[in-house]
From Swiss-Prot:
It comes from Delftia acidovorans (strain DSM 14801 / SPH-1). GO terms for molecular function: ATP binding; ATP hydrolysis activity; DNA binding. CDD domains: ABC_SMC_barmotin. The keyword Cell membrane does not apply. Disulfide bonds: none annotated. Belongs to the SMC family. This is Chromosome partition protein Smc. Residues 807-849 are annotated as: Disordered. SUPFAM superfamilies: P-loop containing nucleoside triphosphate hydrolases, Smc hinge domain.
Amino acid sequence: MRLNSIKLSGFKSFAEPTNFMLPGQLVGVVGPNGCGKSNIMDAVRWVLGESKASELRGESMQDVIFNGTTHRKPASRSSVELVFDNSDHRAGGQWGQFGEIAVKRVLTREGNSSYFINNQAVRRRDVQDVFLGTGLGPRAYAIIGQGTISRIIESRPEELRLFLEEAAGVSKYKERRRETENRLSATTENLTRVEDILRELNNNLDRLEKQAEVAAQYNALQSQVTLKQQQLWFLKRAEAEAEQDRVRVEGLQAVNELEERMADIRNNESGLETLRQAHYDASDQVNQAQAKLYESTAEVGKLEAEIRYVLEGRQRVQQRLQQLSEQVLLWNSRREEAEAEIENLEGAGMDAEEQAEMLAAQVEEQSMRLPDLEDALRNAQKADTDQRASVVQVQQQIQVLAAEQRSLDEQRRQFETRFERLRADRNALETPDEARLNNLQSQLQEARELAEMADAVLNELQDSVPQLDEDRRTRQQAVNAEAARHADLSARLEALKALQEKVKTDGKLQPWLAKHGLDGMQGLWSRIAIEPGWENALEAALRERLGALEVGRLDMVRGFLGSGGHDAPPARLAFFSPPQGAPAPAAGRWQHLSDLLRVNDAGLRAVLGDWLQDCYTAPTLEEALSRRSELRPGETVYVPTGHAVSSHSVSFYAQDSEQSGLLARAQEIEHLEKEVRAQALISDESRTALVRAESAYAEASQRLVSARREASESQSRAHELQVETLRLSQLAEQARARNAQISADLAEVEAQLSDIEERRVAAEARFEELDMQLADSQERHAQLGDKVLESERRLNESREQLRTLERQAQEATFSRRSLEARRGELSRTIETASQQARSLADEQQRAQDELTRLTDAAAQGGLQDALDLKMQREQAVAARRSEYDDLTNKLRASDERRQQLEKALDPLRQRITEFQLKEQAARLGLEQYSTLLEEAGADLAAVSQSIAEANVRMHGLQGEIDRLHREIAALGAVNLAALDELKLARERKTFLDAQTEDLTQAMNTLEDAIRKIDAETRELLSGTFETVNGHFGRMFPELFGGGQAKLVITGDEILDSGVQVIAQPPGKKNQTIHLLSGGEKALTAIALVFAIFQLNPAPFCLLDEVDAPLDDANTERYAKLVASMSKSTQFLFISHNKIAMEMAQQLIGVTMQEQGVSRIVAVDMESALSMAELS
């Protein structure tokens, strides 16, 4: 194990990062005084765990941080790192498996000090454990600073023994013995406490057994009381439930009867409504039959007129045949008569029409009034029904109020009785003396507070340790996950690189390229990059040119084809020669595909600009298609997927060659390489966090063990005081509880009495209010009943007037239609007369034909049918009127029955109200006893079974309960917790007995371990002493050129005795080394240190100007000895002596050209010697 390098940053005068490389076995550090050479020694001591500022030549640990100069700011942190070659695996612990170990310490201005081994955060103790037994440490014999040589030789014997122990490697044994002694001390203390607790616990067991016997009697009696009370409540609950069921059944019967009667009323109302509808339908049928009768009457009149017309026509024809002149006169006379009659008919027709319109308006008006009257009737009926319900509601409220008043009177009597009994109990209550009890309770409170504080600390640690463990596990998982992700990214990267290499080396072109010596050239794709997402577009545009090769001149590619062009490449291949400059970018309507390229080579950009001159981009295929009309001939638009659109075509891209995907893979490889590097950093940070989490978890676990011990001790003390206090506190507590309970009961009873009185007064006032409200409601109900009868009368009169008006309107309409028919007949007569007058010349022949043609047979037959139909319709009208009258009588009778049924509902509703009140009272009783049973946590099935098995009756149960209460009172004060305390005490005694046995066994084991460690340490230290003493006796004359020296044990026991140095240079018989000169002391110390090295050579040794007190002759002997020992130990020494410099295999110069800042410089031997002479 050797030191490879020392890295300093911000440590003392080394403001900048400085790396001391130590390749040889003898490395000398030279430089003028005050340049910072000794800071190197301080740095090594500091990183190995030195925590005392004075040992580092400072007042505080902050002094090791560079504090700035006139031209430099102070550093924010100090860092020192030692890099060791551990190829021989000499380092101990888990780090021994590493071939190289880097130990690092970092200190910030905030005072945060951190240690790292191989970039993993560790504790200071972990750093020291690595070098246990190697002679390395903050104050080990392998680091000899200025003045340390003299301090070693002048150390007290006990201090000098430490160097011997370090050389013997017993540091780990001493650490084990110290830990074992700590455990033995803790075990002894625990055993003493357990024995004290056992003595106290045995004293308490007898008293607890007596108290537990009384508590068992109390529990048995209390169980009987609970059972009897639950049986009483159960029986009362069953009685209330039976009463509720009985009242509910009777109430349901009354409700069913009410519903039956209500169903009768609804059926009656339904029939009444049906009769009303039938009444309306019958009225409509009468009107329809009357209308049909009017139509038949008009038809008979029409047929009679036709018959008359035929007879008159025949007579007229005959008269015409006899005398034309008489016919003309006759027709003229008839025309005049018809015209006169038309004039008369016009006046009658206008009167008839006015009468019909007036009657129609009256019918419409009367019809519009009818709904208002029906609404008024319904509103009156609704108000009457609502008022009737209000009357019933008020009556029910009066009945409920009366029952409530009776209940309040009964409650008041009960509470007054209870009030008197409680006052008597309080007067008879005695209050015990509590002076001593208060003192004990104060002590108990203090003990409990201490126990709570210990529990709080324990709980906090119990909460934090799992969290820290979870954090440790989480960070371990994070380390695994980050490592897996790093491996995954690395695998993906290697796969892509392999695929890329395979594409480059495989294929048909590769042999041809190798043949012409072109296989080592890079394709175009490896020299360009494009914005992410546009790789396919660029491949689609360039195709085989993406793999183009660069040549100096394009003329030289003809030589690749061979003579006659028979050696052409087996696949498409492009060459390019970049020009000297790049063309200026051209502005356009579209974005050029070349604008997306990332190419630094101007010539290469010019080539690509030429190839992609007419290539543009569009974000989507839809946009490219929509704007293709803007393209000029030869221009093409590419979308990210590689599809191409020109002004008259669309080409879809697909990977169809061995060069496809080269550019995308190249960019992905570049991205993955960045991710792999970033992931490596993340993995390192995760491992560092894991080390910190494991350290925090281990520290918290140790604190948890101590906290558990302290919590156990506090709980034991509190338990002892609680047991002592319990006996005294029970009587006082029971007296206070009883007094408080009586006071609370009295206050409650007074409040209940006051509340009952207020409720009783309010009930009386409410009763009077409801009485007056009932009288008002009944009066209002009577008024509303009269209003309903008046509305029904007005509605019936309105309906009768409507039917009369409808009949008159139908008659007026029939009269108007008859006049219109007569007027039409007269108009035809006038027309006929006019025609006859105009055609007298040929009338004779036509008259003869008409005489033959005219006949009344058809009219006579139609007349008889019309008369029969008229008679039938007259009978139908009479039948409809008879039905209408019958329905009117039935409607009146049905309405009277409805009113009778409604009056019969009031007594039945009153009975239902009474049943509801009874059921409510039974339900309240049921709920009361159910609540009591539920609050008592009673098992209803078990209570019911106990009642059935013992044939329990309600009578006498209360007396039995009172008797049990008296027996309980006779027991006096009872410690109810005695049973649990006795059980806990016995369990605790069993546990403490086992713990005593375990602790005794542990003490024996620890004492045996200490004896074994002492024996091993004594044997190892004795052997080391003899060996070192021999080496010391041999090296002393070698350094002094004679004389003698030895080590002497100052006591009988080597484990605790000191070591004294006896040294006598040549010619001297001194009895103590304090009589030696400084140079002699230095040589003696060097001899002792080197003697220790002979036994257990440290990996390296640091010597800070130890040759300063020596003359040249002693220095030469010192240098020779160091040179011989460098075969097994690496030496780093600081010296101003040219003799010492000559033995160095490597020289490191330290200078301070900038005031206050140390730097290293290369030094040759001549410069070093001259520097030594100048110093």
